[in-house]
């Protein structure tokens, strides 16, 4: 049994399989999952686990070179937006419309569905390399 790092075996496998520029999505409970994209559902109850808890856990195990957010988060979910910026630190953020975000999610290797129930609490994480 693993004793540290990502304990969720499905998420751990996806992260291990990522290549440079591959993408995953961390999503709130309501984001639609496109047909053909793997859904890893970790939602337990409304709010559990939170989007930010999952983002922090994934970030600890993943080399991230870019983040994409729906631009609507800047107005409609300012608190989560601020916290996302704090978690990702100096990783570049690209903003797109929510409709563009949903279209981009079709390219993701997986979508991790959280229990988050605040608007636009979704991000696309682009894999980097550690060398």
From Swiss-Prot:
Q: Supply the EC number(s).
A: 5.4.99.62
> Catalyzes what?
beta-D-ribopyranose = beta-D-ribofuranose
Q: Please list every transmembrane segment annotated in the UniProt record, as residue ranges.
A: none
- Provide the GO MF annotations for this entry: D-ribose pyranase activity; intramolecular lyase activity; monosaccharide binding
Gene Ontology BP term (one): D-ribose catabolic process
The cross-references to SUPFAM superfamilies, in alphabetical order and at most eight, read: RbsD-like
Q: Which Pfam families match?
A: RbsD_FucU (PF05025)
Active-site residues are: 20 (proton donor)
> What's its top-level EC category?
isomerase
Q: Which UniProt keywords apply?
A: Carbohydrate metabolism, Cytoplasm, Isomerase
Give the metabolic or biological pathway. Answer: Carbohydrate metabolism; D-ribose degradation; D-ribose 5-phosphate from beta-D-ribopyranose: step 1/2
- Quaternary structure, from the entry: Homodecamer.
Q: Which family does it belong to?
A: Belongs to the RbsD / FucU family. RbsD subfamily.
From the Swiss-Prot or TrEMBL record, give the protein name: D-ribose pyranase
What organism does this protein naturally occur in? Oceanobacillus iheyensis (strain DSM 14371 / CIP 107618 / JCM 11309 / KCTC 3954 / HTE831)
Query: What taxonomic ancestry is recorded?
Result: Bacteria, Bacillati, Bacillota, Bacilli, Bacillales
Its gene is: rbsD
């Amino acid at each position: 049994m693993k004793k540290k790092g990502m304990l969720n075996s499905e998420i751990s496998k996806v992260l291990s399989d990522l290549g440079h520029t591959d993408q995953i999505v961390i999503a709130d409970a309501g984001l639609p999952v496109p047909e053909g994209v793997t859904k890893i559902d970790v939602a337990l109850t409304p709010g559990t686990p939170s989007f930010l808890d999952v983002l922090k856990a994934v970030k600890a195990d993943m080399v991230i070179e870019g983040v994409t957010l729906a631009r609507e988060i800047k107005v409609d979910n300012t608190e989560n937006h601020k916290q996302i910026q704090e978690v990702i630190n100096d990783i570049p953020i690209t903003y797109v419309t929510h409709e563009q975000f949903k279209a981009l999610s079709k390219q993701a290797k997986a979508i991790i569905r959280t229990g988050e129930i605040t608007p636009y609490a979704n991000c696309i994480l682009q894999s980097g390399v550690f060398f």
